[in-house]
Amino acid sequence: MVRFEEEKFEYIIDEMKPLLEKHYDEIAMYKDQISLNPNYDLYKIMDDTGSLHILAARDGTVLVGYCVTFINYHPHYKDHVYAVNDVIYIDPGYRHTSVAPEMVSELERLMMEKGVSVMTFHMKTYKPFESLMEMMGFDKAEYMYSKYIKD
């Protein structure tokens, strides 16, 4: 049975690294130009200041998924705290089960406890999970475009 736990960055990051690699391989754009190179120091600072939230999905002791969220007051709406999804990943063997909706539901519960007004998720157009978001009561809010311009 999969359970969900809030975890601190410094205690989970080593376990997350193999899943981060799989996640990058599955969804990253511009792989020929941009390699996976997370700023772990920044994540640690954000965790220490309370603006980072990590929800782990575990089957027994095995990490099978994570949802990393940034929590902060929105610069446009200073009276409201937003929870902005950074990354969400569930091992392929646990997809199309109850794990994803249970994870989102647990995250919503935890964010409500923290005084969050709005939760946002983003997804790749070639790896959508719109049906999950709509099932969970989320509204499609905006589109985003991307273009690699460095070289």
Give the location of each predicted region.
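A conserved beta-strand-loop-helix scaffold within acyl/acetyltransferase catalytic domains
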Residues: 31-54, 58-59, 67-78
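A conserved beta-turn-beta hairpin within the catalytic core of GNAT-like acetyltransferases
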Residues: 73-85, 141
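Conserved acetyl-CoA-binding loop-helix of GNAT-fold acetyltransferases
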Residues: 96-109
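Helix-loop element at the rim of GNAT/NAT acetyltransferase active sites that forms part
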Residues: 18-33
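Conserved catalytic-core motifs of GNAT/GCN5-like acyltransferases
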Residues: 122-123, 139-150
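A short beta-loop-alpha structural element at the N-terminal edge
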Residues: 1-19
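Conserved beta-strand-loop-alpha-helix junction that forms the acyl-donor binding cleft
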Residues: 119-130
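A short, internal acetyl-CoA/4′-phosphopantetheine-binding micro-motif in the GNAT/acyltransferase core
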Residues: 86-96
